[in-house]
Regions:
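Extracellular/periplasmic carbohydrate-active domains that bind, remodel
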Residues: 1-112
Length: 112
């Protein structure tokens, strides 16, 4: 059996370890992106969100990184259009151009 090194190194990371707030008020875009970048640099893994409301603008998923929204977790898109990035007038909450082995899963909700 052949298992890739990335699969062996994949780890779960609690969003709160990166200073990501679940209060529904704090704009978490930079903290979430830093978490994704960190997990990517470590070879991949899953960023796990637990009960709460997580306000964010656009974040870019990277290869081998996934997001898990557990039951009661809500990823809330900020109402400000200026907090979103995109090309050619297209803006999105989660951007993943050219990335592999990514995903968003769980029983939580994406609002926005």
């Amino acid at each position: 059996m052949l298992i890739s090194q990335g699969a062996l190194c994949a780890k779960d990371y609690n969003a709160s370890l990166f200073g990501i707030k679940s209060d529904g008020i704090t704009l978490n875009t930079q903290s979430i992106q830093r978490a994704i970048d960190f997990i990517s640099e470590k070879g991949g893994g899953k960023l796990k969100f637990y009960v709460g409301r997580y306000l964010t603008g656009s974040v870019q998923l990277k290869s081998n990184v996934s997001i898990e929204l557990n039951e009661g977790a809500v990823l809330v898109g900020t109402p400000s259009i200026y907090d979103y990035v995109g090309a050619n007038g297209m803006k999105a909450l989660i951007v993943a151009d050219g990335q592999q082995n990514i995903g968003v899963s769980g029983k939580g909700v994406i609002e926005g």
